Amino acid sequence: MSVDQTRLQMAVGVTASPAPERLHALDAVRGFALLLGIVLHATLSFIPAPTRIWIIQDNHPSMTLAVLFFVIHVFRMTTFFLIAGFFAHLSFHRRGGRVFIKDRLQRIALPLVVGWPIVFAAMVPVVFWAANFPNGGRVPGAPGWPPVLPRFPLTHLWFLYVLLEFYAATLVLRTGMAWLDKSGDIRAQVDRLIGLTMRSPLAPAILAVPIGIAFNLDPTWFGWLGVRTPDQSLVTNLQAVVGFGTAFGFGWLLHRQIDLIRVLERRWLLNLVLAIGLIAASFVLASVPWPRPDAVRFAGATCYALAIWTTTFAVIGVALRFLSGFSATQRYIADASYWLYLIHLPIVMALQVAVSSLDWPWPAKFATILLVAVPVMFGSYQLLVRYSVIGAVLNGHRIRKPSEAAELIRTQS
């Protein structure tokens, strides 16, 4: 490495990594988080509840799927935003600010602006269809449209809107920091603080403090809510800003010292064991009636906040430990996951309505929803997206290789 290259890395705060293949694991985690979102939304019609919480309530509810929802909801989006912040810092310093902004507008803003009307329009007939079922609720009245701003039904695409907010905030903060900290002393202190935090066994507890406080400031919070989803307003709620913003910012700063991710790899088993215990405790605190609700709410909020970060670290650590090498199949799934997540909700909702009144056991219904939806969506990605303009917008230009299909078959055999 030349002296100029070394100086450049020091200037941007990025240390050389002897194992760049680790980024394959992080890319896999990002795709995994999006695919888990499909599973999570597929569980919603089966969750036992005294009142309908989703477009349709299946006639065969399942506590097992309710537990699956709870577990996924604990860590999925915090993990996603941490990885998003990590890769945002990588992209910013690899491409420069101007290209980074152009790239984010193409890959995040354009899918939101173009995709939202299409997805929302596809959801409307499903809502009308569901209204014909006794357990499908009623069609929203005309006075509810258009929504009165800032209320706005962002649907599951809220994560794109929040990402754009975080990109903008980060660029403003970075510009201000570069102006205030010309010597780099403040950034060096921040790097040291991040390093001390990551190396400490209390790292999940330290990072859990902001979202734990946000939970406790909300008198209506309870464990099944988790971080309140900011899907119904253009003003992102406090819990989402604090919880997901902490994750995004930490991911951005973590990439400045990329070797720190090895700590997560070394502690994967410890974090996994702790995560299982904390999720179990959070579930009990959220589900069992207790004589002192205020005290239990505080305990539940604290436990849930710890579970968020311990599970996030566990999932990333497991991926770093077992998925660091390149895999064509793994890369294909990671690339496809973005498209699948963008389009999945109307498809999943329609299938939920279709099976809701059938006299099938819930495992058969749940499996049917996923086994129909997922292959259809993967097929649409391969045939309509991967080598098309849509694929270029979402994942960058891709040249079809004659050997690609053969390689996929080889890796799966």
Spans of features found by a protein language model:
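Alpha-helical transmembrane segments and their immediate juxtamembrane cytosolic regions
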Residues: 2-413
